[in-house]
Amino acid sequence: YAFEESFRGGVNVATGFTTDNRDSSNFRYADIIAGRGPGGPPEVRVFRLLDAPNLPNGLPQFFYNQAASFLAYAPDVNFGVNVASRFRPGEPTDDIVTGPEAGGPHVRIWNGQVIGDLQSFVPTLQSEYMAFDPTTHVTGVFVGGGQRLSATE
């Protein structure tokens, strides 16, 4: 379960390279980014793939551990959180982009800082903005990711 088993508000999911997760052959694995749906605090969790032995039939098995958990908005905002990842050229990790499912068009971009062994994501609010006029757009906003380019690219 991405959140406690009793939570029934749904989960918004994205993938991204928020930790520098590589195997012994330098293959990089994407992390799972989960935004809590409506009915709870605006929590985002990041799950990192762990190395695991293959099953007896030779098929791979996958285990994930929680690498991060943070509130994308004030604790009393319980509309749910949409999530995406954004690639940053030249950086080891992606950003996480969040948008509320309801309550306004408040987009936030979280910088993918990592610590120690590059297995934990430490969120730092990089920027935020209103995607639309918040006085007229009172529903939420879906977010998407991709590669951040400069004006000269």
Predicted regions and their residues:
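Repeat-based blade/solenoid architectures
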Residues: 1-15, 68-85, 128-149
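Beta-propeller blade repeat segments, especially FG-GAP/WD-type strand-to-loop junctions
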Residues: 1-2, 43-65, 69, 107-126
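Terminal helix-to-tail segments of small alpha-helical proteins
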Residues: 32-35, 46, 70, 88, ...
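Compositionally biased, low-complexity repeat tracts
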Residues: 5-6, 12, 31-36, 54, ...
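Disulfide-stabilized cysteine-rich extracellular repeat microdomains
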Residues: 5, 18, 49-52, 75, ...
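Short glycine/acidic-enriched loop and turn motifs that connect beta-strands
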Residues: 37-41, 101-105
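Intrinsic-disorder/low-complexity regions
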Residues: 11, 19-25, 30, 50-56, ...
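Beta-propeller blade termini
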Residues: 11-25, 30-33, 81-98, 141-153
